């Protein structure tokens, strides 16, 4: 009986020690590296705006699969609202290196829909997988480049789905090589856990940003890059605006 009691006591002590070594579930989770409600945090809200006139791009002419795609498709490279708000601009808080804070918490996809990539622009954490798929009844392709380097080139019949991992930071341009010359999309891969893409009004919101001073980077496929400084204070909304001009677009 004494031997059995000692064995049970040893087992309990061992399990207790193991629990201390492993830590709590929150400490070992990817979620633990995200800002929590108990930490001082604020919000960033802003807008990307185009100042001055610009020439609205003409639609692309379609040369292949016109029976499905039609004779032309819209050019999504510069979408501007009535008050100058720029859609599909990427906003990233620079200087926060925390790739685990969001990686794996969301599903990312690039679809072929109505002869266009959807979404046209997205931002994903470095290390994420992206699902490539095709909801059109015609053959598509996803040819991804970072600069001049090909990351992947995948044929996509309507039945095929493929996952690809994005393991490096940078701007990835995706095109369709199946003579769909108008098709393009951009995937911005970042290690910052705080990012956004502007909506149709050119606006964005980034929640739960730890209090502090930051640089914010703005990028748009046609308008280029800008950087702004911002102070985030606990419980407050910090406002920022990036204004671009369009000399060559």
Over which residues does each language-model region extend?
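N-terminal secretory signal peptides that target proteins for export/translocation
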Residues: 1-8
């Amino acid at each position: 009986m004494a031997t059995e009691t000692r064995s049970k006591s040893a087992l309990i002590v061992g399990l207790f020690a193991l629990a201390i070594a492993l830590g709590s579930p929150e400490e070992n989770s990817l979620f633990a590296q995200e800002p929590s409600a108990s930490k001082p945090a604020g919000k960033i809200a802003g807008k990307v705006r185009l100042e001055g006139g610009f020439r609205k791009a003409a639609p692309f002419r379609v040369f292949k699969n016109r029976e499905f795609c039609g004779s032309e498709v819209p050019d999504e490279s510069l979408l501007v609202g009535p008050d100058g708000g720029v859609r599909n601009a990427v906003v990233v808080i620079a200087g926060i290196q925390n790739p685990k804070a969001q990686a794996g918490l969301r599903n990312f996809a690039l679809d072929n829909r109505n002869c266009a990539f959807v979404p046209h622009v997205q931002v994903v954490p470095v290390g994420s997988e992206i699902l490539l798929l095709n909801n059109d009844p015609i053959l598509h392709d996803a040819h991804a480049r970072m600069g001049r380097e090909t990351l992947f080139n995948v044929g996509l019949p309507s039945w095929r789905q493929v996952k690809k991992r994005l393991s490096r930071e940078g701007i990835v341009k995706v095109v369709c090589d199946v003579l769909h010359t108008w098709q393009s999309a951009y995937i911005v891969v970042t290690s910052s856990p705080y990012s956004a893409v502007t909506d149709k009004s050119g606006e964005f919101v980034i929640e739960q940003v730890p209090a502090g001073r930051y640089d914010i980077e703005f990028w748009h496929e046609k308008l280029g890059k800008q950087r702004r400084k911002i102070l985030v204070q606990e419980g407050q909304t910090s406002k920022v605006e990036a204004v671009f001009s369009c000399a060559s677009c």
